[in-house]
Amino acid sequence: DAQESRGLGDVYKRQGENMQKKNCVLCISIGIIVCILLSACSRQPDFDAKSYVQSSLDAHYHGEYKDYANLLEISEKDAKKEIEEDFNESIQQQFDDSDNITDKGIADYAEKLTEVKKLAKYKVQDVKEEDGVYTVSVQVEPSNVFQTLQQSSTEVSNEKIKQGLDGNDPEVFAAVLTESVQKSLEKNRYGKAVTVNVSVEKDNSGKYGLLDTEMNKLEAAMFPTE
């Protein structure tokens, strides 16, 4: 009986050792799978510089916020608010030292310039990456809306003078501004397409974006003043 007990004990011992071996193999296998999954989850997706530039331009100039908001992981409402506030602030700054225009006049002028922005014609093309900096080429068709603005302003001002109106009156001044822009909008023409290269790089927080200087470069090409 004792011998039989020892025999059964050996069997159980071997079974236990086999189970431990299997458990060890299972642990290693699970460990490998977990490592693979963690690696896949922690690996950041490649930044799509082309989509970023396209959606940025669509949002800032054509008022199309969906893709831009998705890339920034914010709501369309917040994206729209952010862009509109920046734009309105830049318009307001133009009149900080001026007393001859009302808030309504500034708002009307800003609304008219929003129409100008929608004239922007661009096509995002090639992307090159080097040392974490993306160079994106954008083909733009320059609008002459600002090139004709001085002439439009002169024409509108002369019309107001003929009507006996005072150009220093805040309402008249605002009317000259908005009507001049409208006049240039109506005779807008596009020039020969040009290619502009802009850089998309990480900011201090590690997020990719277009610096103001790069956006200004694109805007100067789309809406030249000379």
PLM features: what roles do these ranges have?
Residues D1-Q15:
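Single conserved hydrophobic/aromatic residue that forms the stacking wall/gate
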Residues Q20-I28:
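Bacterial N-terminal signal peptides that target proteins for export
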Residues L37-A40:
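C-terminal motif of bacterial Sec signal peptides marking the signal peptidase cleavage site
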Residues S42-E115, K123:
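Core segments of small alpha/beta cavity-forming domains
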Residues L72-S75, D126-K128, V138-P142, D212-N216:
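A mature extracytoplasmic/lumenal domain signature
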Residues Q93, D97-E171:
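Surface-exposed, charged secondary-structure patches
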Residues A110, F173-R189:
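Intrinsically disordered, low-complexity acidic Ser/Thr-rich regulatory segments
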Residues V156-V172, E186-E226:
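Short beta-strand edge/turn micro-motifs at domain boundaries
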